[in-house]
Amino acid sequence: MRVSYNWLKDYVKVGLSPQELAERLTARGVVVENVVRANPGVEGVVVGRVVAMERHPNADTLWVCQVDVGGGRVLQILTGAQNVTVGALVPAAVPGAKLPGGVTMGVKKLRGLDSHGMLCSEAELQVGDDADGILILPPEPGLEPGMDVAEVLGLNDWIFELDLTANYAAHCQSMLGVAQEVAALVGGEVNRPSTYTPDAPGTDVRNLIAVQIDAPDLCSRYVARVVRGVKIGPSPLWLQARLRAAGMRPINNIVDIANFVMLETGQPLHTFDYAQIRGQRIIVRRARTGERFTTLDGQERVMDESVLVIADAERPVALAGVMGGEDSEVTDQTADILIESAHFDNINNRRTSLRYNLPSEASKRFTKGVDPSGCVAAADRAAQLMAELAGGTVVAGHVDVCPRPAVPPVILLRTERANALTGLKLTPERMAEHLRSLGMAVLTPADLAADLALGAPESDEEPGEDLGGHPVWTALHQVSPVPSDPVVYRTWAEAAWAEVEDAGSRLEALLGGGESDGKAAASGEGVSPGGASDGILVVVVPTRRSDVAVEVDLIEEIARCEGYDAIPLELPVLSSHRGGRSRQGEVKLAARRALAAAGLTEVLTHSLTHPRVYDMLALPEDDPNRRCLALANPMYEDRSTLRTMLLPCLLDVVRYNANRQVRDLAIFEISHVYRPVEGEQLPDEPLMIGLAMTGNLAPLGWNSPERPADFFALKGVVEHLLAELGVPDARFERSAHPSLHPGRQAALVVGGKPVGLLGELHPQVQERWELPGRVYVAELAFAPLMEAMLPQAVYRPVPRFPAVTRDVAVVVDLDLTAHRLETAIREAGGDLLEEVRLFDVYQGERVAEGRRSLAYRLVYRAADRTLTDEELEPVHNRVREALKALGAELRS
């Protein structure tokens, strides 16, 4: 934001140089990125009056002008501009004058005639972009030939370029907001401009325009005023200078006044040609789906119900807070002006601005936050200036529709807590001084008790009546403008008194009463002038300070007013107790290390996705994973719901890499998914482990072939993870998940409960995701694995005695799983059986159809002796008998 130093001095006595002011503002948190001269290098250019002109005898496109440049001098200056007329006041760069870029003017011969300097355009003075004609200065009292153009155009100024952070974006996006900060800095007062304009007798504005708000959630206030009989023309030079200093281009007096008031107060305004408002009615409503509207830039906009529009009785006339329409814009023929001063929802306004790519100073302010209490004052200021600068007559009264009046918050500040948090040692009086300098009202608990003891003011009181006897109630009327409309005021008064009562309840709770309905505070109990309440300040915050909502916000304001440099340097008091990870954190780290050791790369994916991914995964309509949480206001269509699975996110990563010729990939992610819970407001957020492998796991080498990813490689990674975590009693069972290949998938079961799936991606799912090769995926629930882990690792000493190996081969039916066979072998082998390994599988012509041959290697060992054949043979026979019991045929 650009702030003019000269303009700032209209509102506050600065008393500091521009550079010093910039440094001190930055130290208070209002960051001044740069201080630059407003003058781009214009020196010696004066105001000239064209007293005579004629065509150049040797050039049809040139004019020979006689220009009065003051001091009794009339110079001959030649120009090719076609907008110059006799009597026009123009910038004349006389010999010796300097223009931006370091050009020094002299006498130059053009087609045989001398030109003593030149007449300047906006572009040549670098005060605008218009290079087609000479800058014509509007005739004003006191504007005479010979005056310094830099002074006339307001170029002898300094410009502060502010970088407003979120804490200052709302209240510092106006000249008065910055002036309040400067006043607090230098200990002065803000000189707010008067908005008084005598209303024209006769018609009331309510007889000329009616306002209806059909979308109160998107528009909390709409104020309208009417000014009749205006004359459209150029703005006075002082107003043009103010706009240029702020980086805006002057257009005409009506548009310039609206922009000036926005820059001064922070409240965006819009002006309509009153004659074009059909039915003399304004309706603030949502657009209808498919409704069309042509904005001021000539573009037709197609709208839907998410767009807020300002409409008359027949059609939209503006995109609310963004841009007006062609049909109601102010033109040179406009005589009557309808002024709009409203408060629109910041999120909806930003979304509309982005949707139609219509950034503007108005939408920027609505997005960051505008004071809803300032609507009437801004409309009055604009009406005043239109009467003064455009010759208009202000119609009496306002139309003020306000379904949700803004009430200044009442915040309780504990002074001891403020000192404890900041490290400062300020008195309550010093804190109150800082807060009052920012336009806040500071009272005592006794004042609040007095309000509550007196009770609510009479409901028929009007704003401006005597408010004596109610200190906090009076402050609520003073820190921000209150509604002038009686109906709106009564609504405001109810909400304001509710704020007073709530403050009383909070005060009683602070003084030790716990939860309260405020009755004790109302009677004055525990709120005496002395005692515990001495350390509490009751602060009423203006509505323009939307960033100050709770106690710590006040503490921040006190700290920056006192100066961050005043905060003492103290080492923090550290606890001797060392922090550590939670058990979940430890297990998660162990899982990450195990998967990384297995050769997988960790990825982090976005937790937002789109419901169509579940169609791509071929999930049935009743699958629980389709029940996902949708965002109320998604920024992007593809990021509209919270994920219920990691699988689609991992497939997105595989596709992204494949599109960039990375076909060999092994990745994992350990992240949360989000699943709605029936009857609960918040979802379940289980932690999941996701794996994905594709391409080759090992490249082609001089001594080894490529090793492509397959189901068993994926299964091996899962087994490695289980072993590293110490998860016993895990097995793999057949499964039938629709996203996976029907013959190459399995369910992981731990402790008799399914905890995950693994397998090859179904070919149709692979095709929908446009993946070039086979992809192997797994998704495991983290919590059941953590619960099943052994409490601690069991140490086994290095074996001292040799092992004995025996092989056993069996022929079994195809439906008898290897897991059942291995379980039977281990149970029969007992403590002496150390290892069971399947080393051969055969299915072919030497084995009957429907059967297969499995060969196992069994390793036996005793911890305290060498096993003999006599000891081993009975154990091995038990293994054979156990296999026979399952229907296995032993092979020799």
From Swiss-Prot:
The keyword Magnesium applies. It comes from the Bacteria. SMART domains: B3_4, B5, FDX-ACB. Pfam families: B3_4, B5, FDX-ACB, tRNA_bind, tRNA_synthFbeta. Residues 406-569 form the B5 domain. Disulfide bonds: none annotated. PANTHER family: PHENYLALANINE--TRNA LIGASE BETA SUBUNIT, PHENYLALANYL-TRNA SYNTHETASE BETA CHAIN AND LEUCINE-RICH REPEAT-CONTAINING PROTEIN 47. Residues 39-150 form the tRNA-binding domain. SUPFAM superfamilies: Anticodon-binding domain of PheRS (SSF54991), Class II aaRS and biotin synthetases (SSF55681), Nucleic acid-binding proteins (SSF50249), PheT/TilS domain (SSF56037), Putative DNA-binding domain (SSF46955). Keywords: Aminoacyl-tRNA synthetase, ATP-binding, Cytoplasm, Ligase, Magnesium, Metal-binding, Nucleotide-binding, Protein biosynthesis, RNA-binding, tRNA-binding. GO terms for cellular component: phenylalanine-tRNA ligase complex. It is found in: Cytoplasm. GO terms for molecular function: ATP binding; catalytic activity, acting on a protein; magnesium ion binding; phenylalanine-tRNA ligase activity; transferase activity; tRNA binding. Belongs to the phenylalanyl-tRNA synthetase beta subunit family. Type 1 subfamily. Mg(2+) binds at residues 547, 553, 556-557. This is Phenylalanine--tRNA ligase beta subunit. GO terms for biological process: phenylalanyl-tRNA aminoacylation. Residues 799-891 form the FDX-ACB domain. Its EC number is 6.1.1.20. The gene is pheT. PROSITE patterns: B5, FDX_ACB, TRBD. Residues 442-518 are annotated as: Insert. Tetramer of two alpha and two beta subunits.
